[in-house]
Structure formats: structure tokens, C-alpha cells
């Protein structure tokens, strides 16, 4: 219990632990590490340390893959590029070093890295947005905004779009750094520590809101298209009134899927914003999808497969309760999640049964694994970047 409390003190509210602690500490029961018979063998292809990682902050530092490279950062300002195949370091820059904008202070990088248009983009809790050249890491431009940048930006239509911690969504010209538009949303008095990622579809940007809604705006000028309620406002105490949609929506076949905290998993028609179905699940981690199944990890560490056509539950795995799971990722024929002790767990996609397990880094993980070209890439809290494959 002491180890759990230490590791997740900053994230207690996000993981739903605070609600249990507020009334009865004994109600928090962390599942023991499952003892399994593995049928899938996972091997480490390469690993590298990227600075100091998140420095024990609740910062979802997540790598990005493009141009045959893996890009990763630490909270202090290190951004590095590695060869995707071999893991060899290609370049590294320090955005928080003496002589930079931040002098000797940490750059406070946060959220994920975005790539596109030969650029690498990363934001900071301080409100600084950095745009780098993907070839060598040189700074193309940087811009101060009036809010925290806590999630991965979107690069689309030659713009970089970010959701700020104060509820604003802001777009800049990717080449010049000039502001293109700004969209303002109301923010409740009490919200989770985080913001939704953004996705693009047919010239529009879609993102979750602290008010329990999904919003769509035109990328060209930021005009609102529609808002859809994932989780309606609720009464009760302050904790139950937190209804953020901090997960990044996903779109497939004209339907968007999103999940909220203290709320619902919803399927939404992209064209109109009409809610097609809702189911009662509480999550702040993003979803993943494969075939007809949606996969999600709930705030209390349960893993579910949901039929995306009907919203009906296909299977559930309760054996990782309160182990601080990341969002899921598809890895071969398995669903991969990582827990607070740094163990990667593989679940069969069709049944949810445990099929593999390996310890990656005992410092633990917050950001979701990244599955690309048959490999799984993970970045731990202490900055260890690991590439895995199935033997």
C-alpha cells in the first residue's frame, strides 16, 4: 500500500483512488501481480534512457514515430530522435538548458509528441509550444500561450492545434507560428489534471471537454460544428461531479467513440454529433480499437472489450484492479497494458485471458504503449524508452 500511495499521490484523483480514500482507506485493494502461464513471449529489441523522464510528476510523456525515427522527450526539456529499427540515437537537443528561453529551469515538457510536415511538436506545462525540425531537432519557432499544454497537439492542414488546461483550443500556422484561431470552452470548478488529445477528420478537429462533452470545430477557422454530451452534469459531492472527457476520441467508419470519467462510453455519429449509444464506464485513458472491438481500461484498473456496433460487453478482465493501468494498445493478437510497477500484461483479444507478462521498468508507466509495425514502444516514468517485439 505504501508503494502504491507514493507512486500515485499526484494521480490519486485521476485514478479514482481519492474517492475511496476519502471515506475508507481499507476500501483500496490493489490486485497482486497475476501469476500466469505465458503463451506469448516478448523480447526487448532495444532500450535507451531519455533524460530524467517525468521527474515523478504525473506527466504522460509518450513517444512518437515517423520518418523511420522514434522521438521522445523528458520533462526537463530533452528531446531525442532514435533510429526506429536499431535504436541508435540520431540527435538530441535540450530545450531547458542555460541560454535557452527557460535559462537553467526545467522546460516542463508534458503530454505527447506530434509529428508531421517534417516537424516535431511538443508542448509544456509552462505554456510554451515548441516546433522542431525533425531532421536535426533545431527549433523552427516557439510560442508562449496562456495555459498549460498537457496533451498531444494535432498537426493538420498546415496547422498545429492544442487544447489548453484552461479550456481554450488554439491553432497556429505551422510554418510561421502566427495564431490562426482560438476556441473557448467553459471549464467546471473541479476537473481532472489533464486535457483531451485532438483528432482530425474531414477538415474538422474533435476533442473532449471538462464539461463531459465532445466538440467539433472547423480546422480552417475554429468555428464550432457540434457538441455532443458523453456524460451529463451530475449532482452529489465534488468528486462525483467530475465528468471530464480527457481521453482522445477515435473515429472509424463515420462513427466516433469516446469515454468520460465518472460517466459513459459513447458512440457518436461524426457527421451530425448524434449519440448512437451509451454505456456506463468510467475512464480517463484513451481507447483503442481492432476489428469490431473497442478496448478500454477503467479508472479502477479493469480492462474491457466492447462491441463497437452495439456497445455490448464482449469480455472483462478484473485481475489488474487498482494497478494504475495505462491505456491499452494492440500488440500482435493481444491487448497490451502496463501497470504502476512497470509490468507489461498481454491479454487475448478474443477472451481477455492473460497470455503474456514481462517487467519493463520497476519505476512504472503512465503513458500508453505505442504499437507500430509489429513493435511496441514504451516510455517509463524515469525515461526508459523500450522497443519490444513478439518472439
Residue ranges and their predicted role:
Residues 84-86, 133-136, 173-177, 219-222, ...:
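Short loop/turn segments that connect beta-strands within beta-propeller blades
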Residues 74, 117, 124, 164-165, ...:
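Structural signature of WD-repeat beta-propellers
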Residues 1-21:
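Sec-dependent bacterial lipoprotein signal peptides
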Residues 15-37:
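Bacterial Sec signal peptide processing site at the extreme N-terminus
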Residues 28, 36-64, 92-114, 140-156, ...:
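Extracytoplasmic beta-rich repeat domains
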Residues 295-305, 312-346:
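Loop/turn-rich, solvent-exposed surfaces of beta-rich toroidal or solenoidal domains
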Amino acid at each position: 500500500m505504501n508503494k502504491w500511495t507514493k507512486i500515485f499521490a499526484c494521480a490519486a484523483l485521476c485514478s479514482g483512488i481519492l474517492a475511496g480514500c476519502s471515506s475508507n482507506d481499507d476500501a483500496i485493494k490493489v490486485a497482486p501481480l497475476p501469476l500466469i502461464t505465458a503463451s506469448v513471449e516478448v523480447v526487448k529489441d532495444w532500450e535507451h534512457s531519455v533524460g530524467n523522464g517525468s521527474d515523478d510528476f504525473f506527466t504522460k510523456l509518450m513517444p512518437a514515430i515517423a520518418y523511420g525515427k522514434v522521438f521522445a522527450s523528458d520533462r526537463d526539456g530533452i528531446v531525442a530522435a532514435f533510429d526506429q529499427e536499431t535504436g541508435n540515437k540520431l540527435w538530441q537537443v535540450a530545450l531547458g538548458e542555460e541560454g535557452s528561453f527557460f535559462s537553467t529551469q526545467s522546460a516542463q515538457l508534458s503530454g505527447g509528441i506530434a509529428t508531421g510536415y517534417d516537424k516535431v511538436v511538443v508542448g509544456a506545462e509552462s505554456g510554451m509550444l515548441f516546433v522542431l525540425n525533425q531532421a536535426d531537432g533545431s527549433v523552427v519557432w516557439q510560442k508562449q500561450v496562456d495555459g498549460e499544454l498537457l496533451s498531444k497537439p494535432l498537426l493538420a492542414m498546415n496547422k498545429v492545434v492544442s487544447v489548453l488546461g484552461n479550456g481554450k483550443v488554439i491553432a497556429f500556422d505551422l510554418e510561421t507560428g502566427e495564431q490562426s484561431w482560438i476556441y473557448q470552452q467553459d471549464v467546471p470548478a473541479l476537473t481532472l489534471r489533464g486535457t483531451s488529445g485532438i483528432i482530425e477528420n474531414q477538415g474538422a478537429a474533435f476533442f473532449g471537454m471538462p464539461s463531459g462533452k465532445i466538440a467539433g470545430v472547423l480546422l480552417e477557422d475554429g468555428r464550432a460544428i457540434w457538441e455532443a454530451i458523453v456524460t451529463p452534469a451530475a449532482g452529489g459531492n465534488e468528486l462525483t461531479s467530475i465528468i471530464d472527457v480527457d481521453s482522445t476520441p477515435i473515429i472509424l467508419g463515420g462513427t466516433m467513440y469516446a469515454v468520460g470519467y465518472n460517466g459513459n462510453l459513447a458512440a457518436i455519429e461524426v457527421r451530425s454529433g448524434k449519440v448512437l449509444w451509451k454505456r456506463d464506464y468510467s475512464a480517463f485513458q484513451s481507447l483503442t480499437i481492432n476489428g469490431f472491438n473497442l478496448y478500454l481500461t477503467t479508472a479502477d484498473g479493469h480492462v474491457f472489450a466492447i462491441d463497437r456496433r452495439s456497445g455490448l460487453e464482449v469480455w472483462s478482465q478484473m485481475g489488474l484492479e487498482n494497478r494504475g493501468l495505462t491505456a491499452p494498445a494492440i500488440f500482435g493478437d493481444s491487448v497490451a497494458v502496463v501497470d504502476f510497477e512497470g509490468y507489461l500484461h498481454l491479454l487475448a483479444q478474443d477472451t481477455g485471458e492473460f497470455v503474456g507478462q514481462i517487467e519493463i521498468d520497476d519505476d512504472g508507466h503512465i503513458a500508453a504503449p505505442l504499437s507500430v509495425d509489429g513493435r511496441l514502444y514504451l516510455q517509463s516514468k524515469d525515461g526508459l524508452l523500450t522497443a519490444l517485439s513478439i518472439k
